[in-house]
């Protein structure tokens, strides 16, 4: 049932229009195929007038510009949470090795592992460290021609994704290793860590979804990674199993930041959700112009993902996109009888239609079902916290107190 609804979801635009190929070659290595982009599916799009379109264009431009300005400031001032900065390479050498395999600088092509409307994802092996990497390959001219919003091209999405990934480093987030952008060529590459396991979706079809044990393990990783993003003022915007990759050791990593936004001063208000329709929060399905909390919308998407992992189907899905949105907004949540009461409570809390009453990720991390036998979800002591702590310790060692008066 789940796989049937999954395939249907692709046909109505829930996955296919986001740059994914819509199919997977099961014989190929499992890719980190996050070369996706979402089309804005507004349930009132047919009723919008020119004035509303202009207002949305201004808002879209303002939101994206705000994110880019914040990111540029953080990068320019070294406000990043990475122990090792992303390498930036401005020279591209394309060729072949002695076996006739194509090469990009130090990387030797192995096979194509994904494709999308923006470009393709190819598995490469580094001749320097012998490791495998997933490289997203783009043509800059194509990105500049491809319009994704009234005032934005696909190049804006890709550059914003790069900037976001440059400031982040976490074990539950796909890591950006290098960016190759030679101004003398039309090629642009993102070198990412290769996740050699599977998608969260794999194995989630009949006859029994994932089961509580696996779903709990995956959820803990998802919550840990997303809490880190929110703590660093990043809204993912498209949390769904397709963007959650599982390593061979079972660790979940969040990928695809192509529609993500950043905020500051605790102001996470957004308009026009860019995410996948069946994972869209009710407040994002309402008449355009209404703002919503990006963090609360991300949390709803976590709830839909958990529902999928546990029950093997979507909580709200209809025959058309319009009807799907109507169900998300108006239909009651249906949870089968006999489900673990603690799990039922968690799903109901995550999929609360009122965002002000919806569970926060902190609530989720402390929920009895999530704690289970594994204990509380550990707080990740990230690089910027470690760096700040070391500076405080260094200051104390030098006799400088945070509260000391320099005068």
Swiss-Prot record:
Effect annotated for changing residue 136 to A: Abolishes autophosphorylation
Induction: By geminivirus (CaLCuV or BCTV) infection (at the protein level).
Domain Protein kinase: 107-370
Keyword Kinase (UniProt): yes
Broad class of enzyme this protein falls into: transferase
Catalytic activity annotation: L-seryl-[protein] + ATP = O-phospho-L-seryl-[protein] + ADP + H(+); L-threonyl-[protein] + ATP = O-phospho-L-threonyl-[protein] + ADP + H(+)
InterPro entries: Kinase-like_dom_sf, Prot_kinase_dom, Protein_kinase_ATP_BS, Ser/Thr_kinase_AS
Organism for this UniProt entry: Arabidopsis thaliana (Mouse-ear cress)
Basic and acidic residues bias locations: 31-40
Residues binding ATP: 113-121, 136
Phosphoserine modification, residue list: 260
Misc: Functionally able to complement the yeast elm1 sak1 tos3 triple mutant.
Keyword rRNA-binding: no
EC number: 2.7.11.1
GO molecular function, one term: protein kinase activity
Protein name according to UniProt: Serine/threonine-protein kinase GRIK2
Record-linked CDD domains: STKc_LKB1_CaMKK (cd14008)
Tissue specificity statement from the Swiss-Prot or TrEMBL entry: Expressed in shoot apical meristem, leaf primordium and emerging petiole (at protein level).
Gene name of this polypeptide: GRIK2
Family: Belongs to the protein kinase superfamily. Ser/Thr protein kinase family.
């Amino acid at each position: 049932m789940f796989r049937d609804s999954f395939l249907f979801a692709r046909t109505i635009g829930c996955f296919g229009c986001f740059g994914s190929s819509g199919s997977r070659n099961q014989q190929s290595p499992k890719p980190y195929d996050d070369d996706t982009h979402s089309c804005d599916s507004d349930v009132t799009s047919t009723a919008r007038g020119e004035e509303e379109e202009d207002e949305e264009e201004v808002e879209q431009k303002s939101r994206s510009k705000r994110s880019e300005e914040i990111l540029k400031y953080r990068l320019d001032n070294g406000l990043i949470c990475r122990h090792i900065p992303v390498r930036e390479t401005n020279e591209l050498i394309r060729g072949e090795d002695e076996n006739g395999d194509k090469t990009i600088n130090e990387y030797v092509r192995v096979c194509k592992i994904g494709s999308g409307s923006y470009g393709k994802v190819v598995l490469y092996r580094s001749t320097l460290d012998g490791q495998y990497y997933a490289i997203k390959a783009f043509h800059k001219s194509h990105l500049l021609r491809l319009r994704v919003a009234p005032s934005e091209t696909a190049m804006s999405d890709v550059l914003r994704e790069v900037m976001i990934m440059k400031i982040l480093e976490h074990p539950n987030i796909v890591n950006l290793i290098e960016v190759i952008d030679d101004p003398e060529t039309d090629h642009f590459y993102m070198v990412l860590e290769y996740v050699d396991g599977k998608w969260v979706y794999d194995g989630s079809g009949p006859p029994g979804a994932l089961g509580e044990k696996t779903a709990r393990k995956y959820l803990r990783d998802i919550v840990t990674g997303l809490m880190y993003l929110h703590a660093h003022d990043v809204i993912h915007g498209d949390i769904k199993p397709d963007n959650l990759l599982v390593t061979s050791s079972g660790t979940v990593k969040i990928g695809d930041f192509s529609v993500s936004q950043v905020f500051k001063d605790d102001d996470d208000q957004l308009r026009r959700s860019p995410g996948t329709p069946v994972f869209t929060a009710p407040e994002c399905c309402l008449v355009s112009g209404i703002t919503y909390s990006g963090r609360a919308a991300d949390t709803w998407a976590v709830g839909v993902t958990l529902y999928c992992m546990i029950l093997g189907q979507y909580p709200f899905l209809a025959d058309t996109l319009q009807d799907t949105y109507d169900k998300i907004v108006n239909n009651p949540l249906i949870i089968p009888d006999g489900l673990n009461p603690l799990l039922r409570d968690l799903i109901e809390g995550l999929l609360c239609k009122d965002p002000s009453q919806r569970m926060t990720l902190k609530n989720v991390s402390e929920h009895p079902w999530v704690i289970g036998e594994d204990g509380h979800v550990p707080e990740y002591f990230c690089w910027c916290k470690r760096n700040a702590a070391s500076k405080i310790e260094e200051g104390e060692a030098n006799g400088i107190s945070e509260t000391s008066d320099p005068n």
